[in-house]
């Protein structure tokens, strides 16, 4: 379960990106946050994964508060696909980019290869594993980023863009 209590965040003293935001997402529940450009949707996503820290309020995963001390533990439970998937590509090909998170979690190579093929296939990118990310369309990049997150089998997946679905 995710619980957000009275969250505030500002990029400047005059301009609140978020003010007094509270919500709860139970296990197996989906939450969609909709709004105009600049309404704080990406800010909420970044707060939920600990990229930004709340200036007021709190975020809990089950009974664990997201803090500097717990952020690494919680990040292992949460995956995010950003609005611009280019920010998630680190390698020379699609296969490497799907594998990146798995390598960080020390998944054995034999298991990693199976997961790469399984999730690339699930998103229709199995024929693109050796392609360079910069040669892909925006939608293909989204699918590669989603495959990488799904392969991690996280408890929570945050899609910071309507077209990430």
Outline where the language-model segments fall.
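A short, flexible loop at the N-terminus of ABC-type nucleotide-binding domains that lies
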Residues: 1-4, 8-20, 68-70, 109
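The feature captures the beta-strand-to-loop junction immediately N-terminal to the Walker
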Residues: 34-36
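Conserved ABC transporter NBD signature motif
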Residues: 57-65, 74
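Helix-to-loop junction immediately C-terminal to a conserved catalytic motif
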Residues: 49
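Conserved ABC ATPase "signature" region
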Residues: 110-128
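Catalytic Walker B motif of ABC-type/P-loop ATPase nucleotide-binding domains
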Residues: 157-160
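Conserved ABC ATPase signature
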Residues: 132-136, 140
């Amino acid at each position: 379960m995710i619980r957000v209590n009275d969250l505030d965040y500002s990029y400047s003293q005059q301009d609140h990106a978020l003010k007094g935001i509270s919500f709860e997402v139970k296990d197996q529940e989906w939450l969609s946050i909709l709004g105009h450009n600049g309404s704080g949707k990406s800010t909420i996503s970044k707060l939920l994964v600990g990229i930004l820290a709340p200036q007021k309020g709190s975020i809990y995963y089950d009974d664990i508060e997201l803090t500097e001390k717990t952020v690494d533990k919680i990040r292992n439970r949460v995956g995010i696909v950003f609005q611009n998937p280019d920010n998630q590509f680190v390698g020379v090909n699609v296969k490497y980019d799907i594998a990146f998170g798995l390598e960080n979690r020390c998944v054995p190579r034999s298991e990693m290869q199976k997961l790469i093929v399984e999730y690339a296939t699930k998103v229709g990118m199995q024929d693109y594993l050796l392609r360079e990310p910069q040669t892909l369309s925006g939608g293909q990049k989204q699918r590669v980023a989603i495959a990488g997150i799904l392969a991690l089998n996280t408890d929570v997946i945050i899609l910071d863009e309507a077209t990430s679905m």
